[in-house]
Design a protein with these regions (language model features):
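Redox-cofactor binding/interface segments in oxidoreductases and associated redox assembly factors
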Residues: 10, 95-96, 163, 317-319, ...
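C-terminal, flexible cofactor-proximal segment of oxidoreductases
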Residues: 446-494
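A Rossmann-like FAD-binding core segment of flavoenzymes
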Residues: 280-325, 332-334, 339-343, 348-349, ...
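Glycine/Thr-rich phosphate-binding loops of Rossmann-like dinucleotide-binding domains
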Residues: 18, 71, 104, 171, ...
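Flavin-dependent oxidoreductase catalytic cores
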Residues: 1-234, 238, 246-249, 253-254, ...
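Internal hydrophobic alpha-helix adjacent to the cofactor/substrate pocket in enzyme cavities
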Residues: 170, 175-176, 243, 373-382, ...
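Glycine-rich dinucleotide-binding loop and its adjacent helix/turn
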Residues: 211-224, 288-291, 299, 320, ...
């Protein structure tokens, strides 16, 4: 109370100290704090009592507990229900979440990725709410839209909903919901990249869709253009869309040209893979922002010198993206070799497939899932420590679990050397020794892309101010693309 807070929450979830006392697989004490369920609850009960004894009566006291640790050696839903039911009378509220840091599988639920169903802990909170009387129940975990939260509360599954990532993605979400502007809400897609992913790297929390989040002081007031300029943005991927939105929001007349028939760029590839469909939400969200900002979008529009001269822009943002690249591969006879984009375009593989994962991101994982689900025998050779090494660990570990269940054989520390006669040759990058995979019908290579920056050659001599952003600058992720769409455009126009 002296600190000016209205309440205290005891974090007893996720394998932290309070939950360690609660768990029979961790708590082997033989004194009054171990043994039977009542003794294992004693530590948490005494923490609650000590807070009550030393604080004013009106101070709110709650506890966050995992409703299910989703760990084979952890506390399941039945055990947690009894724990919550017994602790509830001494608490003002219970905050129900899931998971544990005690295992990779359990930790996935600490910040559940897009593969976890929306509001998946609501059935547990509904059951608990019926049993705890006046104690309020808060539920969290993949609740990313206000309509979902309202439904949970309306149906009596909880009194409150926690929506942390939803608020990072769109800090104005509650205000928009209260005004009935639900379609304007930028929905979280559960990618975990710039929120918990940043936190785990010791970086400021942000959002790949909304880089202003966490940088409010820097971008609190976007400078308005003194004179509206005619801005041309070339490329309709995440970088180009964010650039166009930023240019329009600062008072300029903005047109976006996209060479293909759809906006989205590399995000279209992401949403086409198994368990990544929700990533397409970034496209929907940015398209909505384009409309609201008044950006003129022209699809099937090629950017070349004559077209640019005819349009006569005052400034150009090149977000032309990247193009596929295939590394030279020794041999090549007797093994079908495909690029991962060939698979998405409909190419068929043989029965026995080796996927070479150069990137260690989500693409090779998606390829392995896609081909395995179609009936192929898949081996995944990874140019890194493990599949998904470059992506956030909860997303990665959930994917590794899926690959294991599908029977995908994974080999790490692989560098592709060559392929011939139904055999693929690798070098183990740590041991510097050969690794040979035999009986291979098809080798699918997942390499990095190369920047698509052709127009920059003549634009340099045109005298038109311009910036190159996103994959056109260097192929990376949607986070860097959207961030540069914001920062480089502001730099160009102010």
């Amino acid at each position: 109370a002296a600190a000016g807070v209205d309440g205290v929450e005891i974090v007893g979830s996720h394998g932290y100290l309070p939950s360690q006392f609660l768990s029979p697989s961790i708590n082997f004490r033989t004194d009054q704090y171990g043994g039977n369920p009542e003794n294992r609850r004693r530590f948490v009960a005494e923490v609650i009592q000590s807070i009550r004894a030393s604080c004013p009566e009106e101070l709110i006291v709650g506890a966050r507990l995992s409703g299910d640790e989703f760990d084979s050696g952890g506390l399941d839903e039945d055990a947690m229900f009894e724990i919550c039911r017994n602790l509830a009378p001494s608490l003002d509220y219970l905050n129900v979440i899931a998971g544990t840091s005690a295992s990779s599988g359990g930790s996935v639920h600490i910040v559940p990725p897009m593969t976890v169903s929306n509001g998946y802990m609501a059935p547990f909170s509904a059951k608990l709410k019926q049993a705890v009387g006046p104690t309020a129940v808060l539920v969290a975990g993949r609740i990313n839209q206000p309509q979902d939260a309202e439904k949970i509360v309306r149906e009596g599954a909880a009194d409150m909903c926690g929506m942390t990532r939803a608020m990072i993605c769109d800090p104005r979400m509650p205000a928009k919901a209260s005004l009935g502007q639900v379609d304007d809400i930028r929905a979280c897609i559960g990618c975990n990249q710039a929120c918990i992913g940043h936190a785990q790297l010791g970086l400021p929390i942000s959002c790949i869709q909304y880089p202003e989040s966490g940088r409010e002081l820097r971008f609190a007031e976007k400078p308005r253009a003194e004179v509206s300029r005619r801005v041309l943005v070339v490329g309709g991927g995440p970088a180009g869309m964010k650039a166009a939105i930023t240019a329009a929001e600062t008072g300029n007349s903005v047109t976006l040209w996209e060479r293909s028939s759809r906006l989205g760029g590399q995000a279209l590839l992401a949403q086409a893979l198994p368990n990544r469909e929700e990533f397409g939400g970034i496209i929907n969200n940015l398209e909505g922002e384009l409309r609201r900002a008044g950006v003129s979008v022209s699809l099937n529009s090629e950017f070349d010198q004559p077209n640019c001269s005819e349009f006569s822009p005052d400034a150009v943002v090149l977000a032309t993206g990247s193009r596929r690249w295939m590394p030279p591969i020794e041999g090549g006879e007797g093994v079908e070799i495909l690029h991962h984009e060939d698979i998405l375009a409909g190419a068929k593989t043989g029965q026995r497939v080796v996927i070479y994962d150069w990137r260690t991101d989500w693409i090779a994982i998606g390829m392995a899932e896609l081909l395995s689900q179609s009936g192929a025998d898949v081996r995944l050779a990874v140019n890194g420590v493990c599949p998904g090494f470059a992506i956030q660990n909860y997303v990665r570990d959930a994917a590794i679990a899926r690959l294991y269940r599908l029977g995908v054989e994974t080999t790490a520390f692989m560098r592709l050397y060559g392929a011939e006669d139904r055999t693929v040759y690798f070098v183990h990058t740590a041991a510097q020794e050969p690794v040979v995979l035999e009986d291979v019908d098809t080798l699918v290579v997942v390499p990095p892309n190369q920047p698509e920056v052709g127009p920059a050659d003549w634009l340099k001599s045109s005298g038109i101010p311009y910036r190159i952003i996103g994959d056109a600058l260097a192929p990376r992720t949607a986070e860097e693309a959207v961030y540069e769409g914001l920062t480089a455009t502001l730099e160009l126009l102010t």
